[in-house]
Amino acid sequence: MASLCSNSSTTSLKTPFTSLGSTPKPCQLFLHGKRNKAFKVSCKVTNTNGNQDETNSVDRRNVLLGLGGLYGVANAIPLAASAAPTPPPDLSSCSIARIDENQVVSYSCCAPKPDDMEKVPYYKFPSMTKLRVRQPAHEADEEYIAKYNCAVTKMKDLDKTQPDNPIGFKQQANIHCAYCNGGYSIDGKVLQVHNSWLFFPFHRWYLYFYERILGSLIDDPTFGLPFWNWDHPKGMRFPPMFDVPGTALYDERRGDQIHNGNGIDLGYFGDQVETTQLQLMTNNLTLMYRQLVTNSPCPLMSLVDLTLFGSTVEDAGTVENIPHSPVHIWVGTRRGSVLPVGKISNGEDMGNFYSAGLDPLFYCHHSNVDRMWNEWKATGGKRTDIQNKDWLNSEFFFYDENGNPFKVRVRDCLDTKKMGYDYHATATPWRNFKPKTKASAGKVNTGSIPPESQVFPLAKLDKAISFSINRPASSRTQQEKNAQEEVLTFNAIKYDNRDYIRFDVFLNVDNNVNANELDKAEFAGSYTSLPHVHRVGDPKHTATATLRLAITELLEDIGLEDEDTIAVTLVPKKGDISIGGVEIKLAIVKLVCVVNLLTLQLNKDRFCYDSVFVCWFVCLFFNFHV
């Protein structure tokens, strides 16, 4: 390894940093309760204080599930959040990043600022003769591992010799810190790339440049990042190449659970599951199936949440929710433990957004997260990228391998092959891992448990709780199921955004369910959240979210299609949680036109939400195309 790295010196690198200052239409989902329910239109909304509010707290759950995705906007979509694409951050306004409201990051996460941001060009892909191929980390040979260590070593050397060089290791790690912990604000609103539709494209661009930087440092334009293949049984352990002390890929700020060949728990939230390694692997495959198949039938119920910039609701798409977040927590140190330097852990490195990029494993983990975007689309059906212009035209700012600044757009990162890389073909056993075993022999007696009206609002989910809930329709035909997805929705989920959060949802079981065995047909899904900064200046640290679970397939598998009432059980796993309410709706799943209504200036000062929603409504039912 040493000889491989000794061929050139990082101190002789010449980059422009020295001149720096400090496809198919998507499916739209419309919610319906009883089919005879009237549709009312009004541009005025009365809030709980009796005041008229034209821009805030506009609850459109009964109109447009497409504005929420599977984990979506429950309410309070600020006007500024829906009027335009997210612009690249203004580096001149970059501020101190925060671990939470009471702790600031002890160093600046701000990127070096170009002399003139207005002159920063848009990135154009360089010509290529060969695709970079990302391979599974557990299959990497010694030659590749040596090359990878060499590249990261050279990147870390820049931290010492040229600390302001944007291609240095710490500068690259700071990108995640600034974008994810309150470093950037636009018009007074924190720019947060997590819990929003920016999650996948931001991280794809981030890894794209990181990978090219590594390749340039070792003069290998074909170098590809490895991906941690945690979705396959052979990859469900910590990649050995990252656990060798003294190497560039090692990080001492990791949890003890990663060692000794322990299998990863893709639903991990701070506590080890008391079960066998075989059951853990089975749970992992079940979670993968639920997240990428059952609960993600189309783009706005899947990978891409449509939580817009500036929204006060914090929600994630299915893959960001699980397995992305649990993997972060499983690798990081336990919160409250003592770090090697004597400080109290906030989950560093991987378990907190501000420090995650300091662990080389972060990029290997997110390489597989990025791969999931491709695998999800390859599953077929209505799983295609959305074509909303506000998403496609959202922008980020990065430096390339030569230290040159560029702006990039979401629309240019939808095809990895056009970006110059691809993934080594790997089996995906989770794709056909549909749980078939039932936890219950028959239907739970819904008359023996309280109805949802007697349970919600739920002040604290501190123990397993069961309730019954009425369905909007039963005994539906296959044609009706194809047209409308049945969605179980939990509204106004509230929790402290400084904590790890998780609860699981089961159908047709009572509160004695074994929640450590997820490979059951009754397991519907989970809600999770990582500690993060979403709104600076919130002393209560209260996050509000919505969880939506697609249950049509589950009801078929359990044999409850003809039932008017079903039983639901919630099992808390981590954190203090309250839930405002629950309901079951029917969501129309149909390929329709996408009119870029948010760009129509109905009023130059503000938009009338209801006029916009009426247009979407007409677009669906009159099959209007542009």
From Swiss-Prot:
Query: Quick one: which residues bind Cu cation B?
Result: 324, 328, 366
* Pfam families named among the record's database cross-references: PPO1_DWL (PF12142), PPO1_KFDV (PF12143), Tyrosinase (PF00264)
Q: Show the catalytic activity.
A: 2 catechol + O2 = 2 1,2-benzoquinone + 2 H2O
Q: Which InterPro entries match?
A: Di-copper_centre_dom_sf, Polyphenol_oxidase, Polyphenol_oxidase_C, Polyphenol_oxidase_cen, Tyrosinase/Hemocyanin, Tyrosinase_Cu-bd
Q: Which Gene3D superfamilies match?
A: Di-copper center containing domain from catechol oxidase (1.10.1280.10)
Q: Which cysteines are joined by disulfide bonds?
A: 94-110, 109-177
Q: Which GO terms describe its biological process?
A: pigment biosynthetic process
List the GO cellular component terms.
Answer: chloroplast thylakoid lumen
Which GO-annotated molecular functions does the record name? catechol oxidase activity; metal ion binding
Q: Which residues bind Cu cation A?
A: 176, 194, 203
Cofactor binding description: Binds 2 copper ions per subunit.
- What's the name of the protein? Polyphenol oxidase C, chloroplastic
Q: What is the lineage of its organism?
A: Eukaryota, Viridiplantae, Streptophyta, Embryophyta, Tracheophyta
